[in-house]
């Protein structure tokens, strides 16, 4: 139950701004985890739990853009811990950039507490678009710098300037490039702030929802079509060529059809 440690570590180890709200978006409220979340919330006045039952997806975290009350949103997966000084450095950045449309994150800190990945490179690999990368020189300088994309286990926006996110996603996959491009289309960039190191638990046997390849492919098509509007856009053509080499043609066609149906686009098979 990672959210317990994420929340309590924030409360114990960080100087939080006044009127901080812990908004928990629970996509499995009837589970044991869901019941434990509500039990803990009784002990934390500043915690608010919202059940999200209209869809099961990792994308529900972006519902915070219209559900949160604060001016600054810090979105975290429920199994992320923040390095000392994270909150102070984040709030200082926003104090200097109060009207920014940027998405801000920092280097992913691996479990050895030494290795980091401060960005993802926009290339196809395996079943994902994005490969972890590390620009040690930029991190060492300590200044904010633009990156093409980053993992979405930890991110921050000025709430009023966050981009509009599609609600047509289901399951897991497709977030990183989508959120980076949405930010750019909205007039911002993706910024890495080297002081914002975050540790993410990857190896955990129990999941809220299964990782299904079909769902991931559908999500990528929902994402790219929402971004670019046309299967003939070069990014969509490249994606189709890639998936054609990964899955049977009929399976890919079904995934494309489902994505276009969700978006209300005509499909010609």
Locate each region found by the language model.
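Glycine-rich, basic loop-to-helix element that forms the pyrophosphate-binding segment
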Residues: 52-68
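A short, conserved alpha-helix in the catalytic core of glycosyltransferases
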Residues: 89-91, 153-155, 161-164, 170-196
């Amino acid at each position: 139950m990672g959210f317990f440690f994420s929340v309590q570590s924030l409360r114990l180890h960080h100087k939080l701004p006044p009127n901080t709200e812990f908004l928990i978006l629970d996509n499995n409220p009837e589970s044991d985890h869901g019941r434990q979340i509500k039990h803990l919330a009784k002990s934390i006045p500043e915690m608010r739990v919202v059940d999200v039952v209209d869809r099961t997806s990792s994308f529900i975290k972006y519902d915070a853009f219209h559900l949160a009350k604060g001016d600054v949103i810090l979105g975290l997966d429920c199994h992320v811990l923040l390095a000392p000084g994270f909150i102070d450095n984040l709030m200082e950045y926003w104090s200097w950039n109060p009207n920014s449309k940027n998405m801000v994150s920092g280097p992913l800190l691996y479990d050895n507490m030494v290795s980091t990945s401060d960005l993802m490179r926009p290339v196809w690999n395996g079943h994902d678009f994005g490969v972890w990368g590390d620009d040690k020189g930029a991190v060492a300088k300590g200044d904010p710098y633009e990156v093409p994309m980053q993992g979405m286990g930890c991110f921050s926006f000025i709430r009023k300037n966050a981009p509009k996110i599609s609600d047509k996603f289901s399951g897991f996959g497709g977030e990183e490039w989508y959120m980076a491009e949405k930010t750019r289309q909205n007039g911002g960039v993706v910024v890495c702030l080297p002081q914002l190191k975050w540790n993410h638990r990857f190896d955990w046997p129990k999941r809220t929802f299964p990782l299904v390849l079909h769902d991931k492919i559908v999500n990528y098509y929902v994402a790219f079509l929402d971004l670019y509007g046309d299967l003939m856009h070069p990014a969509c053509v490249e994606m189709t060529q890639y998936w054609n080499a990964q899955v049977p043609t009929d399976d890919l066609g079904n995934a494309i059809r489902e994505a276009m149906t969700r978006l209300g686009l005509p499909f010609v098979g």
